[in-house]
From Swiss-Prot:
Substrate binds at N168, S179, H186, F200, A201, G202, S203, R208, Y271. This is ADP-L-glycero-D-manno-heptose-6-epimerase. Keywords: Carbohydrate metabolism, Isomerase, NADP. The gene is hldD. NADP(+) binds at residues 10-11, 31-32, 38, 53, 75-79, 92, 143, 169, 177. The keyword NADP applies. The lineage of its organism: Bacteria, Pseudomonadati, Pseudomonadota, Gammaproteobacteria, Pasteurellales. Contains a large N-terminal NADP-binding domain, and a smaller C-terminal substrate-binding domain.
Length: 308
């Protein structure tokens, strides 16, 4: 069996899809379906069982057995970079992750988890080294602290432990994320409403490493299949502008004039204006597949969003 926490969420459900594509259906999805709309991410996927997150955590703490587990993909967390309830964030993203990590280490179960580029903060160098890490929000701090915890226990680990610092992920199955969904998702919705697509004023200076979720899932699967351990950046290695995203959306629809709106006050000083993954460490593992450009990935995503 394979366990995917956050399996009804954005990246988790794409990992489930990638596993299905390999012929694996013996999957336990763990999630919190209080937001009932997330069920839609699982409708076209094949899984063996579902478990509520709180019940799962209780079972993990109690040391309950789930049978033979080939891997755990831990994507379940609070992913809202705008959430400022530190107690809630640390419980969800740090304490929960530690419990699950030790459960896997004790049973030598390969453990793959979601970290984040938010661990870096305001830097021009995005390399998996302590000197470049300085998160700007409590979400980034929770991910940073767990990475530090993993770094300390990795030398003693007898089974793979692998963290992925996701950069700006976009693509299918993010509909439930609301304001935290990707720019491409929001621009598509604006055009469908008959509006012009809108970017924040000054965003011509913002460049992000936008990575397609299918590529993210592929790296997770490859690292599992190859027994990789460590903490790795997961982006394309190439920063592109928000304008490039908007241009790809407009080109797909064949309509829309890009407008600018004021930059939100609450995001100032808490916003990464530039991200670009240094992929040297990931490439050193032997992973050599290419990543989709914004033009390629957004076009594929638009086709998925607007399918009949």
């Amino acid at each position: 069996m394979i366990i995917v926490t956050g399996g009804a969420g954005f990246i988790g459900s794409n990992i489930v899809k990638a596993l299905n594509d390999l012929g694996r259906k013996d999957i336990l999805v763990v999630d919190n379906l209080k937001d009932g709309t997330k069920f839609a991410n699982l409708v076209d996927l094949d899984i063996a069982d579902y478990c509520d997150k709180e019940d799962f955590i209780a079972s993990i703490i109690a040391g309950d057995e789930f049978g033979d587990i080939d891997a755990v993909f831990h994507e379940g967390a609070c992913s809202a970079t705008t959430e400022w309830d530190g107690k809630y964030i640390m419980h969800n993203n740090y304490e929960y992750s530690k419990e699950l990590l030790h459960y896997c280490l004790d049973r030598e179960i390969p453990f793959f988890y979601a970290s984040s580029a938010a661990t870096y903060g305001d830097t021009k160098v995005f390399r998996e080294e302590r000197e470049f890490e300085g998160p700007l929000n409590v979400y980034g701090y929770s991910k940073f602290l767990f990475d530090q915890y993993v770094r300390n226990i990795l030398p003693e680990a007898k089974s793979p432990v692998c963290g992925f610092r996701y950069f700006n992920v976009y693509g299918p199955r993010e509909n439930h994320k609301g304001s935290m969904a990707s720019v491409a998702f929001h621009l598509n919705n604006q055009i469908l409403k008959g509006e012009n697509p809108k970017l924040f004023a000054g965003s011509e200076h913002f460049r992000r490493d936008f990575v397609y979720v299918g590529d993210v899932a592929a790296v997770n699967i490859w690292c599992w299949q190859n027994g990789i351990s460590g903490i790795y950046n997961l982006g394309t290695g190439n920063a592109e502008s928000f304008r490039a995203v908007a241009d790809a959306v407009v080109k797909f629809h064949g309509k829309g004039e890009i407008e600018t709106i004021p930059f939100p006050e609450h995001l100032k000083s808490r916003y990464q204006e530039y991200t670009q993954a240094d992929l040297t460490k990931l490439r050193s593992t032997g992973y050599d597949k290419p990543f989709k450009t914004v033009a390629e990935g957004v076009t594929e995503y638009m086709a998925w969003l607007n399918r009949k």
